[in-house]
Design a protein with these regions (language model features):
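Solvent-exposed serine/threonine-rich low-complexity stretches and specific carbohydrate-binding patches
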Residues: 97-112, 152
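Short, compositionally biased P/S/T/A/G/V-rich stretches that sit at domain boundaries
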Residues: 26-70, 156
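Sec-dependent N-terminal signal peptides
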Residues: 6-15
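Short, exposed beta-strand-loop hairpins at the edges of beta-sheets
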Residues: 78-79, 123-152
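Short, solvent-exposed, Trp/other aromatic-anchored flexible loops in extracytoplasmic proteins
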Residues: 68-70, 77-78, 106-132
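Extended low-complexity, serine/threonine- and proline-enriched intrinsically disordered segments
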Residues: 78-99, 137
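Intrinsic-disorder/low-complexity, polar/charged segments enriched in Ser/Thr/Lys/Arg/Asp/Glu/Gln
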Residues: 67-73, 148-150
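C-terminal segment of classical bacterial N-terminal signal peptides
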Residues: 15-26
Length: 156
């Protein structure tokens, strides 16, 4: 009887763990990633719908005549622990990479997904057509930049 009870408890535990993993938010799987698009991201009825939109809309190259509008879905690797993060642009065509600009974004301390539509950047702000930029979601913690997510884009 003791053996049956142990097997039953092991099966319940395994089922619970497996169920929790399969139903875990996919933000954890995409954590540390930024998807950038030239089309705005909307709201999605399901995770499947959101993933399809991310695949369809995600781009790494953006065309413009000195100005570009970027829309981002930011999947933080961990909650920021603060009320603000910075979206920072580094020109990686230069050595060493040079910080060009940043945008401060309000978040909840435990927030894992940040949707940021309509971010206008231009040559007037220091961006150069033909250059590559690393886009980072960061926060300064203890005097050091902590990176929660990043991607690389090219402006054409």
């Amino acid at each position: 009887m003791q053996r049956v009870r142990q097997l039953f408890l092991a099966a319940v535990l395994a089922t619970t763990v497996f169920g929790a993993l399969t139903l875990a938010p996919r933000a954890a799987l995409a954590g540390g990633r930024i998807v950038v698009s030239d089309a705005e991201f909307g709201s999605y009825a399901s995770e499947k719908e959101m993933n399809a939109a991310l695949k369809k809309q995600g781009k790494t190259t953006f065309k413009g005549a000195g100005s570009w509008t970027l829309n981002m879905m930011i999947f933080l690797g961990a909650g920021s622990g603060g009320n603000k993060i910075n979206v920072v642009y580094y020109d990686v065509s230069k050595h060493p990479p040079d910080q060009v600009n940043f945008t401060e974004v309000s978040v909840k301390p435990d927030q894992k997904i940040v949707q940021l539509n309509g971010q206008a950047i231009s040559s007037d702000m220091g961006f150069v057509k033909g250059h590559k930029y690393e886009v980072r979601a960061t926060r300064v913690v203890g005097g050091k930049e902590k990176v929660y997510a990043k991607t690389t884009i090219t402006l054409k």
